[in-house]
């Protein structure tokens, strides 16, 4: 079971003050424990790709992060650059304001800019930022992500307050159906929480506490 959980974890370091030694430690831990990926800011993608080149651990990065307020063209450029640098997965933040305006065309175009730029070369996870949304908006965001060709929907950036909840994971799983991934991120700090998210329908866990989760400990980190 521990190995199965490890293969569902995106081992994460997204704080703005993260330093090189922390990224090196992140990659080493990911190799040792067999995590699905390391999730890092774009400036670290090349280093992670080099450190993980002979492993099964993927490099994941973030697009339009953490606000989602960049233009679709900027997000598309970020995506292409990340893939060129070695990323195999990208976690993009939607245009949250457009979603709340019910401007579905703009939201879908924003997501599709990234899925088109990824062009099958990287998995695309769509961060909907659940803490800022009503249930209706969460469902709509999930539906638009699926329509635009995303591979996953994801709860949170970890930068807007709140994080993953079992209730939201269930809602998102119901909204996307069985064939799209659901990533729980934000506040998953121990094995019990991770298992609860998985039982609710999560297929990936984003956490800086990956080592604590697989060891059955509790970490202090929020993301």
From Swiss-Prot:
Write down the chemical reaction(s) this protein catalyses: 2-deoxy-D-ribose 5-phosphate = D-glyceraldehyde 3-phosphate + acetaldehyde
The record, for InterPro entries, names: Aldolase_TIM (IPR013785), DeoC (IPR011343), DeoC/FbaB/LacD_aldolase (IPR002915), DeoC_typeI (IPR028581)
CDD domains tied to this protein: DeoC
Q: What is its EC number?
A: 4.1.2.4
What pathway is this protein a component of? Carbohydrate degradation; 2-deoxy-D-ribose 1-phosphate degradation; D-glyceraldehyde 3-phosphate and acetaldehyde from 2-deoxy-alpha-D-ribose 1-phosphate: step 2/2
Q: Which GO terms describe its molecular function?
A: deoxyribose-phosphate aldolase activity
Active site annotated at which positions?
91 (proton donor/acceptor), 154 (schiff-base intermediate with acetaldehyde), 183 (proton donor/acceptor)
Q: Which Pfam families does the record cross-reference, listed alphabetically?
A: DeoC
Print the keywords alphabetically. Cytoplasm, Lyase, Schiff base
Q: Name one GO biological process term.
A: carbohydrate catabolic process
- Compartment list: Cytoplasm
Keyword Nucleotide-binding: yes or no? no
Protein family (similarity comment): Belongs to the DeoC/FbaB aldolase family. DeoC type 1 subfamily.
Record's function text: Catalyzes a reversible aldol reaction between acetaldehyde and D-glyceraldehyde 3-phosphate to generate 2-deoxy-D-ribose 5-phosphate.
Which HAMAP family does the UniProt entry name for this protein?
Answer: DeoC_type1
Q: What is this protein called?
A: Deoxyribose-phosphate aldolase 1
Origin organism is: Bacillus licheniformis (strain ATCC 14580 / DSM 13 / JCM 2505 / CCUG 7422 / NBRC 12200 / NCIMB 9375 / NCTC 10341 / NRRL NRS-1264 / Gibson 46)
């Amino acid at each position: 079971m521990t190995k199965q959980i490890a293969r569902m974890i995106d081992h994460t370091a997204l704080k703005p003050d993260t330093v090189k030694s922390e990224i090196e430690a992140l990659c080493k831990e990911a190799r040792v424990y067999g995590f699905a990926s390391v999730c890092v800011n774009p400036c670290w993608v090349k280093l992670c790709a080099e450190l993980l080149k002979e492993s099964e651990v993927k490099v994941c990065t973030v697009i339009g992060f953490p606000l989602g307020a960049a233009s679709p063209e900027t997000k598309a450029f970020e995506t292409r650059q990340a893939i060129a640098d070695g990323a195999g997965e990208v976690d993009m933040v939607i245009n949250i304001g457009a979603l709340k305006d019910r401007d579905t065309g703009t939201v879908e175009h924003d997501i599709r800019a990234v899925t088109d730029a990824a062009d099958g070369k990287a998995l695309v996870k769509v961060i909907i930022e659940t803490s800022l949304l009503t249930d209706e908006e969460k469902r709509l965001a999930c539906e638009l992500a699926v329509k635009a060709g995303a591979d996953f929907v994801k709860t949170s950036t970890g930068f807007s307050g709140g994080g993953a909840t079992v209730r939201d994971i269930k809602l998102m799983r119901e909204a996307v159906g069985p064939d799209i991934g659901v990533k729980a991120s934000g506040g998953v700090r121990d094995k019990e929480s991770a298992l609860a998210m998985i039982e609710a329908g999560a297929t990936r866990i984003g956490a800086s506490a990956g080592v604590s989760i697989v060891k059955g400990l509790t970490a202090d980190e929020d993301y």
